[in-house]
């Protein structure tokens, strides 16, 4: 069996097959300040009085928080009141929250082998832990509140075999952008993307979260890593004991892709699709002027990402024509960055440092683009109008490329600084 089949079989209590429909009880049901209010309204419309499993419900206000306007304040107020009313303890108030997909693994809320649903498409991030995690609609979450179950179709799987080691300043973000360019934005529709091979051990947990996070950008249902010694060490730091989990040798896949980490260059995904990836050495030749650089998000807002950005920015200055916004993914990441002196490096370089928020990624706040403006961002989507005005543009890249570009004022190769 594949990893996806193993986890779903364990939850179903029997062996399952791709294409089969299941009604299962997830371990965690997540929603945020955009998706939770609709789930709450629907729960009440369905006649709900008491949430079936309040201990499995997680509510994280992160998209428009700290509240950017009255409407967003009302959204979070609804979440807050629902949590109190239902005895939901895992409501993360502003000041204690983080970007949801950074926060939940960090807090040990999601663990290896879990079945997780979230009313957010990047819930697939937790596949890095060897959890079957996938995005669902707010009405699915409402259904979970009511009966404690959600329907699933067992996905087919794509196997991605990794070999070699990353070269200097090449990262997990570059790997996943390259993979999406190979698969296409719909190449993994309703399939699990499973990572294997000796190269897996070269990727840290922070890097694995980045890769699994963007599985959805190829249409993937989830992006799964095996549970190995790296996963076990991460979980043990949080007081969680898990066992190794690998796919069976005779597991069946609908497609197989091989990638050599040592052959990768830093990547840049051009507008308006995450699959439009090019080598940064080629992009640099075009001298694409930028107005803004964003380093953060559920894709690249972890401590390793900030360390990499600081490595590039230390002793240098952001171009006077560029706004560089740094967003730690959680309060713990922020505190660690403070402890390591990274925040000083960012401020000395001329960056703005924000409290944890999804803000600019979805064009919500904290970095909305004006007409004609261009951004390079460590986020995960660059669709038309994604970060602001419909006539703005977003290029996706790693923290190293984003930081180098902020310094140069145009999309630049960090290896040449």
From Swiss-Prot:
Task performed by this protein: Catalyzes the isomerization between 2-isopropylmalate and 3-isopropylmalate, via the formation of 2-isopropylmaleate.
Pathway in which the depicted protein is active: Amino-acid biosynthesis; L-leucine biosynthesis; L-leucine from 3-methyl-2-oxobutanoate: step 2/4
Superkingdom: Bacteria
Record carries keyword Iron-sulfur: yes
Protein name: 3-isopropylmalate dehydratase large subunit 2
Subunit-structure text: Heterodimer of LeuC and LeuD.
Cofactor binding, note field: Binds 1 [4Fe-4S] cluster per subunit.
The reaction(s) this protein catalyses: (2R,3S)-3-isopropylmalate = (2S)-2-isopropylmalate
Any one Pfam family match given in the protein's UniProt record, by short name: Aconitase
Cofactor needs: [4Fe-4S] cluster
Keyword Membrane: no
PANTHER family in alphabetical order: 3-ISOPROPYLMALATE DEHYDRATASE LARGE SUBUNIT 2, HOMOACONITASE, MITOCHONDRIAL-RELATED
Keywords of this entry: 4Fe-4S, Amino-acid biosynthesis, Branched-chain amino acid biosynthesis, Iron, Iron-sulfur, Leucine biosynthesis, Lyase, Metal-binding
EC class name: lyase
NCBIfam families given in the database record: hacA_fam, IPMI_arch, LEU2, PRK00402.1
Record EC number: 4.2.1.33
Residues bound to [4Fe-4S] cluster: 298, 358, 361
UniProt organism field: Thermotoga maritima (strain ATCC 43589 / DSM 3109 / JCM 10099 / NBRC 100826 / MSB8)
One GO BP: L-leucine biosynthetic process
Family: Belongs to the aconitase/IPM isomerase family. LeuC type 2 subfamily.
